[in-house]
Amino acid sequence: MTLKKYKGKYVILWPQYFDSSLSRKEGRRVPRELAVARPSQKELLEVAAALGLEAKPLEGKYPREWWNKEGPVLVEKRGSKREVITLLAKELRRRRYGK
């Protein structure tokens, strides 16, 4: 699948961006207060759908964790990539821990 037709309209998000067990250096993109333990691709798809964002699963492996089978998610872009990541992180945290 070519991703050129999605450029500018969608962002690619990896579950590792939201993983509390990883450091920023290892790929986490959100503060620890918003991160959760080992998020899955399925969880990200559910959270995006709950927020009204179109999302599609992609195949692939995170380069820093090539042994991990969790693939990325293509998510509709609303605002900047940082804003989309933060929005998903807050909802993921709320669903997981009720905070």
Curated annotation (Swiss-Prot):
SUPFAM superfamilies tied to this protein = SRP19
- Subcellular location(s) per record: Cytoplasm
Q: Does the keyword Hydrolase apply?
A: no
Primary location group:
cytoplasm
- Molecular function GO terms recorded: 7S RNA binding
Q: Does the keyword Membrane apply?
A: no
Describe the protein's quaternary organization and the partners it interacts with. Part of the signal recognition particle protein translocation system, which is composed of SRP and FtsY. Archaeal SRP consists of a 7S RNA molecule of 300 nucleotides and two protein subunits: SRP54 and SRP19.
Name of the molecule in the record: Signal recognition particle 19 kDa protein
Encoding gene per record? srp19
